Amino acid sequence: YDAAAGKATYDASCAMCHKTGMMGAPKVGDKAAWAPHIAKGMNVMVANSIKGYKGTKGMMPAKGGNPKLTDAQVGNAVAYMVGQSK
């Protein structure tokens, strides 16, 4: 995954929820909120982000609600967010 390339996707498609914690999304940079997700591993996080995920605090629509994103773009955005949240 290319975290640097993922920043643009994050800014365009992910920040709306992950910058503010909207709908229960873990805020980028909040190590405690991200820790349980990071513990599952990148492959699980990316798969959940691509297909959608219902967690205990909310739900994430498939591809963050942007079906135009490629799986690679989603993976890169996840890598960017994880890198900012470790």
From Swiss-Prot:
Pfam families, alphabetized: Cytochrome_CBB3
What broad taxonomic lineage does this protein's source fall under? Bacteria, Pseudomonadati, Chlorobiota, Chlorobiia, Chlorobiales
Q: Which UniProt keywords apply?
A: Electron transport, Heme, Iron, Metal-binding, Photosynthesis, Transport
Answer yes or no on keyword Iron: yes
Q: Spell out the SUPFAM superfamilies in the cross-references.
A: Cytochrome c
Q: What does this protein do?
A: This basic c-type monoheme cytochrome has been found exclusively in the green photosynthetic bacteria, although its role in bacterial photosynthesis is not established. It has an unusually low redox potential compared with mitochondrial cytochrome c. It is reactive with cytochrome c oxidases but not with reductases.
Q: Could you tell me which PROSITE patterns the record lists for this protein?
A: CYTC
A GO biological process held by the record: photosynthesis
Q: What is this protein called?
A: Cytochrome c-555
Q: InterPro entries in the record, alphabetically?
A: Cyt_c-like_dom, Cyt_c-like_dom_sf, Cyt_CIE
**What Gene3D superfamilies does its record include?**
Cytochrome c-like domain
Q: How is it modified after translation?
A: Binds 1 heme c group covalently per subunit.
PANTHER family the UniProt entry points to: CYTOCHROME C5 (PTHR40942:SF4), PTHR40942
List ligand-binding residues for heme c.
Answer: C14, C17, H18, M60
Q: Which GO terms describe its molecular function?
A: electron transfer activity; heme binding; iron ion binding
